[in-house]
Amino acid sequence: MIDYNNVFGAGVVAAVSTAGTPHAATSAAAGQYRVAATGTRPWIGAILNYEVSPIFARWPRNRNHQDPWHSFWANSLPTWYRSFLKKDSHQTRKQMKRTC
């Protein structure tokens, strides 16, 4: 039988120990296999850091908890282009001219 602790233990513990506050299920395994973190396969730690860890698996977010890709375009596009992208902006301008 394959010893999965030997195969995956180093990567999982590397993901858990570098992730800050992990899930409770993975932190129980972290204390068990703490020595295996300096494992025989360093590449599987890099793979499992991305695959397993809940910190690295999701899209990185900035301090506002917004998508950095969205906030990059929203902040870098000029104002006239954002108003041009609005739906039916000419109709809105006519409406404003009529009401105000």
Curated annotation (Swiss-Prot):
Q: Quick check: keyword Secreted in the entry?
A: yes
Highest taxon in the source lineage: Bacteria
Instruction: Give its localization.
Output: Secreted
Any one GO CC term of this protein is: extracellular region
Q: Using the UniProt record, give the first listed, main subcellular location.
A: secreted
Keyword Secreted among record annotations: yes
For this UniProt record, the keywords arranged alphabetically read as follows:
Secreted
Could you identify this protein by its name?
A: Uncharacterized protein ML0638
